[in-house]
Regions:
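Glycan-recognition and catalytic cores of secretory/periplasmic carbohydrate-active enzymes
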Residues: 1-180
């Protein structure tokens, strides 16, 4: 809705954007998956940027803190999913990282700018560097999932969870990689 508001300039979208953004307030506390980054980024971050909603600043920073709890320093990545629950638990993963996670970096960079805390920046850069080193094939297509050993940083597996095959190029994932 925020992007529709931005593209059209039509103020009729503003109350809807605010309403649906503020319904996501509790998301700032999610620590069990990486989606908090783009859920808050696409809503609160856009509202902060487009409508000068200064009150969104604290939500953005809190969400970045929640996302940062998923950072695995020895592997240099933000873990996407918990590997011990649900369907993810059946894959044998230890520290799965999906290319979608690149969408979260904007939130971390903005949280650094808003808070002055370079921890968020450092996590974003380290995650991006590690992703560049291990998610991409020689033809520059990317894997959907790279599983790491969270203690050593060693790559355990390169797979897909939603694409056609482990070695296929997944269009949506390619877009997320470019965005990040």
């Amino acid at each position: 809705i925020w992007l529709t508001y931005e593209l059209t300039g039509d103020k009729k979208w503003l109350p809807l954007a605010v309403k649906y953004t503020e319904a996501l307030d509790s998301v700032k506390h999610l620590k069990w998956h990486h989606d908090v980054g783009f859920m808050i980024g696409c809503s609160y971050l856009n509202g902060y940027r487009m409508a000068d909603k200064k009150e969104y600043k604290d939500v953005i920073i809190e969400a970045a803190k929640s996302l940062s709890t998923r950072f695995r320093p020895n592997a240099g990545v933000i873990q996407s999913w918990d590997a011990d629950k649900g369907w993810q638990g059946t894959r044998g993963w230890k520290c799965p990282v999906i290319i979608d996670n690149m969408m979260n970096l904007e939130l971390l960079f903005e949280a650094t700018a808003l808070s002055g805390d370079s921890t968020f920046y450092n996590i974003a850069v380290k995650h991006a560097d590690t992703t560049m080193a291990h998610h991409f094939r020689p033809d520059n297509s990317c894997y959907h999932v790279v599983d790491y050993d969270p203690e050593t940083g060693e790559v355990r597996k390169r797979q897909t969870a939603q694409g056609y095959a482990d070695e296929s190029s997944w269009a949506r994932g390619q877009a997320w990689a470019l965005y990040g």
